[in-house]
Regions:
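Structural transition elements
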Residues: 22, 293, 323, 327-359, ...
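Detector for C-terminal structural segments
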Residues: 56, 214, 218, 311-339, ...
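A structural "hinge/loop" feature
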Residues: 38-55, 80, 107, 131, ...
């Protein structure tokens, strides 16, 4: 089963380093205070958001059919669905909905809410909809395939047979959160199914309800007294926008915040030797990547793509900027999952890059605009690449800022960021990096990094990815993923992966039960404080 392959990447392996004492904390015992960077938060609609910071908030405002506990995310557990069955042909999943669950509005949660929510995700067609659309659900068929048969039963019928765990993992993702359909019907504006309302409000049944959110300032969530698993210990959670690492560190050391989430490697290293702090490092399923737009006649040259792989300072970054934020990984499936290759064939080699550029017809290099997210560690990695590229004759005009929209619309030359695939399975990564069924601009497959990069993925690779997702025999599936890994690496893909994503957080020793989560579902209702 997938479970045995996921142990290395389960959030249970969060690494904690306990350290000596600092000033006494000042945050109230019944409140949790988080320091984050809100610059990428564009709203709180679970069927629209696609960022780590928003996802953690959504994970606590809403519930899902399936629970993926941090201690072992490889084994799906009952959530809003207290039980489920899978038909003999593997295509029909029948979920029994838990009774007694209330939304924050006071409305009871029923199978009709589940039906409406999953249909809404598909019909909105935004980036998170890929999580269901990849299994064959469309706006045209979803009403037939996802249906409530009574007040406590929901049937999810897949058009084709897929590995059952893929469907269950999907229904545990934050994108498949269940919304209060009756309440949102009152908030509908022009048929938007409550989308405008949910930018700054919630309609969930999770352990916390949203009190207020001021963008790039402060979010406040209150414990939900009628939460079906019991009222949380933390009466309130405050999420503060503190973009500077040094400011996060000072407030954590001074006891003004309990958790700091975007610290530089320098500040994390200092905390290792100087404070009463725990450093959590949670390996995830995403990558730090460099995207080379294949619409560009220069960047679409395979030798140019290969040259970029020799301009990343893997070793230097591993010991500095990426010490807390990534694990060197140049192949497409992370360690611990079936199909992972035990090899990292590239190293920083400017002369090799020059040779490849000459063979490609660019002995004097070229100039390109390079967009990078201006947060740690992404920007430091981008600056390193810019310096190494210059040595090979490539002039990169590095521009910080929020350019994710340009990436999604394929309006860029070079772009780098980090991804966070949400299923503990190779398919989650391969779906984004190695499938692109329609490479036209009109296809708008914005949830796929391969489409965003305008890469016409070789048919051989795409066919194997599809076959592996359908395969129910785990041994055969692992063999297929090994072949995919080799073929992907040999193709010199325009998505240059360098480090497996690791999420690093610094947590006050007063805080217990705050657990990093590989799929961004960190829960606040498990938290207590000394």
């Amino acid at each position: 089963m997938i479970r045995r392959h996921c142990l290395m990447l389960s959030s249970a392996i969060v690494l904690s380093i306990a350290l000596p004492a600092i000033a006494s904390s000042t945050t109230p015992k019944d409140q949790l205070v988080l320091a984050i960077t809100m610059s990428s938060m564009r709203g709180l609609d679970p069927h629209e958001i696609n960022q780590l910071e928003s996802a953690e908030v959504v994970a606590n405002l809403y519930e899902r059919l399936i629970a993926l506990p941090a201690e072992n995310i490889a084994e799906p557990k009952p959530g809003l669905a207290e039980s489920w069955t899978v038909s003999a042909d593997g295509k029909t999943f029948t979920f029994k909905i838990r009774s007694g669950v209330k939304f924050h509005s006071g409305n009871p949660l029923t199978a009709k809410d589940v039906e409406w929510s999953l249909r809404r995700l598909v019909k909105l067609g935004l980036a998170p909809s890929t999580d269901l659309r990849q299994w064959g659900f469309t706006a045209e068929n979803v009403e037939k395939l996802i249906r409530a048969t009574d007040s406590s039963t929901v049937v999810v019928e897949t058009p084709e047979v897929w590995n059952a765990n893929l469907i269950l993992f999907t229904l545990g993702s934050f994108s498949t959160s269940i919304l209060d359909s009756k309440f949102l019907a009152e908030k509908d504006k022009g048929g938007d199914m409550g989308r405008e309302y949910l930018q700054t409000a919630d309609a969930g049944s999770g352990p916390y309800s949203l009190r207020s959110w001021r963008a790039n300032e402060l979010l406040i969530a209150d414990a939900f007294k009628d939460y079906w698993q019991g009222e949380p210990k933390m009466r309130r959670v405050l999420v503060r926008h503190i973009p500077e690492s040094s400011a996060q560190r000072l407030q954590l050391e001074g006891g003004d915040v309990d958790v700091a989430t975007r610290l530089s490697s320098t500040d994390l290293a200092a905390l290792e030797t100087g404070g009463e702090i725990k450093i959590q490092k949670t390996p995830g399923f995403g990558y730090y990547y460099i995207a080379l737009n294949q619409k560009d006649p220069i960047l679409s040259n395979q030798k140019v793509r290969e040259a970029f792989r020799y301009l990343v300072d893997y070793e230097g970054l591993s010991s500095t900027v990426m010490k807390y934020y990534g694990i060197k990984q140049q192949t497409i499936i992370p360690p611990g999952l079936p199909g992972a290759l035990d090899k990292n064939p590239y190293k920083l080699d400017v002369d090799k890059a020059k040779q490849l550029l000459t063979e490609a017809g660019y002995p004097n290099g070229f100039s390109k605009v390079y967009y990078a997210t201006p947060v740690t560690p992404e920007y430091e990695v981008a600056q390193s690449l810019q310096a190494n590229a210059a040595k090979a004759g490539i002039k990169l005009d590095l521009q910080g800022g929020d350019h994710i929209g340009k990436f999604r619309n394929r309006e860029f030359e070079i772009f780098s960021a980090r991804s966070g695939e949400r299923l503990p399975d190779p398919h989650a990564i391969l779906q984004s990096y190695a499938t692109n069924a329609n490479n036209s601009d009109e296809a708008k497959l914005t949830g796929l990094n391969a489409w965003r990069t305008a890469w016409a993925v070789p048919k051989e690779i795409q066919d194997m990815v599809t076959a592996a997702a359908h395969e129910t025999d785990q041994s055969k599936r692992a063999d297929l993923y090994m072949k995919i890994s080799e073929a992907y690496l040999a193709s010199s893909p325009p998505l240059v992966t360098s480090f497996q994503r690791t999420d690093a957080k610094a947590v006050s020793s007063r805080v217990k039960g705050y657990l990093g989560h590989s799929t961004w579902l960190t829960r606040w209702d498990t938290v207590t404080k000394d």
